[in-house]
Amino acid sequence: MLKTSEKIFSETPSIITKEEGLKILNGVIPLTTCLDKAFQERNRYFENKVRIHILDNIKNGYCPEDCGYCAQRKNANSGVQEYPMKSEQEIYEDAVQAKKNGAYRFCMVTSGTGPNRLTTEKLASTIQRITDELNMKVCLSAGLLDIEKAQVLKEAGLDRYNHNLNTSENHYSEICDTHTYLQRAQTLDSVSKAGIGMCSGVIVGMGESFQDIVDVAFQLKSFRVISIPVNFFIPVKGHTIKNPSVLTPELCVRILCMFRLINPDSEIRIAAGREGHLRSLSATALFAANSLFSSGYLNVKGSEILETVAMIRDAGFVPELSNGEILPENFGTESFYSEKNFPELYKFKKF
């Protein structure tokens, strides 16, 4: 059965001030000190557990919005494969596979400004089936949402609703001009009033300042967001971000530490860009973050599940399942040590 004790709202005050957040990002505070303080809070609320989330892109393209970072935006000419929303059965089968792969939560993502009434009802039906038949937590990302639609999704059993702020209010007009920061904030307000856990995070590396990163971290805190995905900008074909920032692995870890210390009891998730920006520090980042995505992102490939699980275990952490249990130690071992991956192990195999 699903755990019922998971919090909907963040309840713990920030550990640091805005000024201290800037010192972390500017490198004034040693990285080891940042990691030590971040790990203390991470361990306090999440112990040594890591939640693996798997995305299902249930509708790709056909989007009227003009978010500069997105390969699905209007007029992007990015070459992504466009397709309408998957059927309930297709999404359900994807959820079954995600559960087999050890996902803590199944994340459904659809392109577009926001769902209409009929789409909301279809999504609600799918969510209810997944939660009832698979006992699996579900997160939905479907754009702008009002309170009425949020309540329909809540009644269907939706666990989390994702709607990222992406950047600070001051910087928002630099990345999108078809909707406003206020509209995104209003969606979070609707989700909150419906009693759904808020999942809202950022995309770092879109030309923002360190002050912008600190400001949005505290804005998320003010909303009491319980789940914060931290994306590192990937320059996909067709993007319109004018001055992408240079992100080093160390800076990415510092950003995750800062988010942990501002939002101590929130789930801090390493999201898109992990493989390319954190690189050899991916495992180190888990001392600040307690969650990550596996098996790819919306239109970009990512580490597969066996590689992700191995990294988590190698760093001394354990993957957590929706029911609170731990992924078995022998998960994927047989296929991981296959002849394809390690041919030298089979060199002297007798027939």
Curated annotation (Swiss-Prot):
Reported cofactor(s): [4Fe-4S] cluster; [2Fe-2S] cluster
Pfam families tied to this protein: BATS, Radical_SAM
Entry keywords, A to Z: 2Fe-2S, 4Fe-4S, Biotin biosynthesis, Iron, Iron-sulfur, Metal-binding, S-adenosyl-L-methionine, Transferase
UniProt-listed PROSITE patterns: RADICAL_SAM
Pathway membership: Cofactor biosynthesis; biotin biosynthesis; biotin from 7,8-diaminononanoate: step 2/2
Residues annotated for [4Fe-4S] cluster binding in this entry: 63, 67, 70
Molecular functions (GO terms): 2 iron, 2 sulfur cluster binding; 4 iron, 4 sulfur cluster binding; biotin synthase activity; iron ion binding
E.C. number(s) listed in UniProt: 2.8.1.6
Catalytic activity: (4R,5S)-dethiobiotin + (sulfur carrier)-SH + 2 reduced [2Fe-2S]-[ferredoxin] + 2 S-adenosyl-L-methionine = (sulfur carrier)-H + biotin + 2 5'-deoxyadenosine + 2 L-methionine + 2 oxidized [2Fe-2S]-[ferredoxin]
Name this polypeptide is given: Biotin synthase
Organism: Leptospira interrogans serogroup Icterohaemorrhagiae serovar copenhageni (strain Fiocruz L1-130)
Organismal lineage: Bacteria, Pseudomonadati, Spirochaetota, Spirochaetia, Leptospirales
